[in-house]
Design a protein with these regions (language model features):
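Gram-negative host-targeted secretion-system effectors, predominantly Type III and Type IV
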Residues: 1-175
Length: 176
């Protein structure tokens, strides 16, 4: 899998989120997928930290922070990294109960190294927990909004065959 870089900007939206531990990847010949996903997860974590830093002003975290990261990584990866972050910091009272509950619903495999340390700890966002909580709330809202808005192409693909045939028939009939 090739990751394309364009003048410092990296688009990793098309790299699938690999949700299994390194051992599973090794056993199934999927190490390349695991490594590409892990690289994208790390870059996403860093992009979230940067976006929070750039878009937190006057005690407000602006929605552009999420849009900036989503453009590069997509919502699935952002939410995966945020779920890992909240799970790793479950003891932290600055995360809302709602976000903690949500994080428990996201499938994340424990990924132990040779010393018994969960490799997921390296993917935890290192910004202020209160700001990460706000970012998570905004990211979840943004992901829901994008779920509800299918693209025009998506609507055409999901259109029943009868409706598509009727639309074609109407365009071919001459107007009277």
């Amino acid at each position: 899998m090739t990751v394309h870089r364009k003048e410092g900007c990296t688009n990793m939206k098309n790299i699938p989120v690999y949700r299994f531990p390194a051992g599973h990847a090794r056993e199934n010949g999927e190490l390349e997928l695991y490594r590409a996903s892990n690289k994208a997860n790390t870059a996403c974590k860093e992009a979230i930290e940067k976006a929070i830093s750039e878009h937190y002003c006057d005690n407000v975290l602006h929605r552009e922070a999420v849009a900036q990261v989503a453009e590069q990584f997509g919502h699935e990866r952002i939410l995966y990294v945020l779920a890992i972050t909240i799970r790793q910091k479950d003891w932290d009272g600055r995360f809302s109960a709602d976000n903690k509950q949500w994080a428990k619903t996201v499938p994340v495999s424990e990924n132990l190294d040779a010393w018994g340390t969960d490799r997921n700890c390296y993917l935890a966002v290192n910004s202020h927990s209160g700001l990460v909580d706000l970012f998570t709330k905004l990211a979840r809202e943004d992901a829901r909004a994008h779920e509800r808005k299918p693209s025009v192409l998506g609507r055409l693909k999901n259109r029943p065959p009868e409706a598509a045939a009727e639309a074609v028939k109407k365009t071919k009939e001459p107007s009277l």
